[in-house]
Amino acid sequence: MMNFAVLPGVDINIFLLIFIGLGAGILSGFAGVGGAFVVTPALIILGLPSNLAVGTALAWVTGNSIVAVLRHRKLGNVDTKLGLILAVAAISGMEVGVRILNWATNMGLADEVVLSISICMLIIVGTYTLLECSRRKRQLDKMLEKEERLPSAMSATSLSQKLQAINIPPMLHFAKSGVTMSPWIMSAVGFFVGTLAGVIGVGGGFIMVPSLVYLIGIPSFIAVGTDLFQIIFSASYGCIRHAMSGNVLILVAFTMLAASCYKHQDSIRKDNHSTH
């Protein structure tokens, strides 16, 4: 068995880490998320304390996002201006999240806090996504019944339209995303996602992508690339802060990263082949 001791009394099979890295890399490529919402629980199941699982997952997602965003930038799916605004806000939230996790660790509540917040957020995001998909399906069915022409895109939700109508200066136009909105609203979204990311050890993609689509109202393919772009900055900061607290196992993160990077490089080669 290819096991190595990551902690006293904790041995992890290297093939399990490779499998986790490959699986998370595939999810990252398809859904535009960092993949750490899979990595963090998996590391906890393998026996790592929650604080180490969180820090190590952020180290992995930093490298994974750098490789993934290269592909999306090549495809033109990155709104740089929006991504930088989200990144600055997410970094501020990340600091708050790291402090919350350190407090929970000192109180002996890290496992309960990380797992309970992760489960709650997955339920909330999943439920809202299903409700919104159902609403759009009903809207399309009505248009088909009336034989109306279907729109080429339906990115704007009722909630995103209300948020875009809030006039808090300065109002910025994001040409790539096709929206005009106050950066303060976007910063609030970034701060909230960054705080959660710092606590539960994710890049925030599984929350950020639905937020960009349903709250901000940008196309899903732009949301995917832009989220991966901002994750590079926010996850890097979170990784450094967790490393300062001794919460990062670099060998574990590197093993998973090698597997996920191989998957991303395979996708890039397919993209290059399809464009020639």
Regions found by a protein language model. Give the residues of each.
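Juxtamembrane transmembrane-helix boundary motif
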Residues: 1-20, 74-192, 214, 244-276
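Alpha-helical transmembrane segments of multi-pass membrane proteins
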Residues: 17-21, 59-62, 189, 229
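Transmembrane alpha-helical segments of multi-pass membrane transport proteins and ion-pumping complexes
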Residues: 21, 25-33, 37, 64-69, ...
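Alpha-helical transmembrane segments of multipass membrane proteins
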Residues: 25-26, 42-45, 69-70, 194-195, ...
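Juxtamembrane transmembrane-helix termini in multi-pass membrane transport proteins
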Residues: 36-83
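Interfacial segments of multi-pass membrane proteins
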Residues: 39-52, 207-222
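Short hydrophobic/aromatic, small-residue-rich stretches within specific transmembrane helices
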Residues: 57-61, 227-231, 253-257
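Membrane-interface helix-cap regions at the ends of transmembrane helices
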Residues: 64-75, 233-249
